[in-house]
Swiss-Prot record:
A GO biological process held by the record: protoporphyrinogen IX biosynthetic process
Cellular component, GO annotation: cytoplasm
Residues reported in the UniProt entry to bind substrate: S117, N133, T134, R135, G286, G287, N288
Residues that, per the record, bind a divalent metal cation: H121, H131, H169, H199
EC number: 1.3.3.3
Main location as per UniProt: cytoplasm
Organism: Agrobacterium fabrum (strain C58 / ATCC 33970)
Compartmental location: Cytoplasm
Protein name: Oxygen-dependent coproporphyrinogen-III oxidase
Site residues by UniProt (Important for dimerization): H199
Functional summary from the UniProt entry: Involved in the heme biosynthesis. Catalyzes the aerobic oxidative decarboxylation of propionate groups of rings A and B of coproporphyrinogen-III to yield the vinyl groups in protoporphyrinogen-IX.
Quaternary structure, from the entry: Homodimer.
Amino acid sequence: MERPILPKGLPEDIEDKKAVAQAWFQHLRDTIVASFETLEDELTGPLSDQEPGRFVQKDWLRDNGEGGGGKMSMMEGRVFEKVGVHTSTVYGEFSPEFRKQIPGAEEDPRFWASGLSLIAHPVNPNVPAVHMNTRMVVTTSHWFGGGADLTPVLGRRRTQQDPDTQLFHRAFEITCNRHPIADYPRYKSWCDEYFFLKHRDEPRGTGGIFFDWLHPDEEKGGWDANFTFVQDVGRAFNLVYPKIVRANFNQNWTEEDRDEQLIRRGRYVEFNLLYDRGTIFGLKTGGNVESILSSLPPVVRWP
């Protein structure tokens, strides 16, 4: 999607809005962490004789704390081979080369950004991998962005007719339809367009939603309406993805399934390192490299 020209100017209470958004992202992180640890406890199928995983949290600082920081929450368990649920709030100035790519940064390079990012790589190949993030960005303008997408790793499950994919799509369609400022058909198409490996001419997964540059429209409720939608995206994710995990995590799998999973993970690596805007943004703004690259799966294979 082509980047729009966003109105410039910040509301008088922008600092209050920043604080509210940051607090929400941290609350959502804690909610998802608890939800995923519950999934670890509930496993009764393969590997249920192993200890359930628990998140390990680690704080990090940008520019020795002068540019903000964040909290990494990582878990390696019997349901999730690797999952990261990270929050960050960073601020500073964009580099000259990066200013032209960010709305409102050409005239004034100062920025503030806060958000949550999650990527989960399950152990069981029957359970799809997933990504979700939501964020608020402030320059001389301000906006929200985010989305969620599903990546089944088995070819027989990587279809639009698969019940996991249909449940995932339906959850976000319902969420978008509750908010006049949201546009589900556009966000769904945007997701398909964004999460696409051009060099392989194939999608990364089976889609979801993706949105960016969501700027307040006072006729549709302004900042509050946008923020409420972003909150509901997080809530919808925390409802639908655990349902998908529970529907699959007790199933058996074969060595061939595991091999296919590892090859599909390779596509994940290719996308994140070649195309992902969040990865590029984090690396170019002095983000925490360990946190940024924690999205990569723990074990991968290329044929």
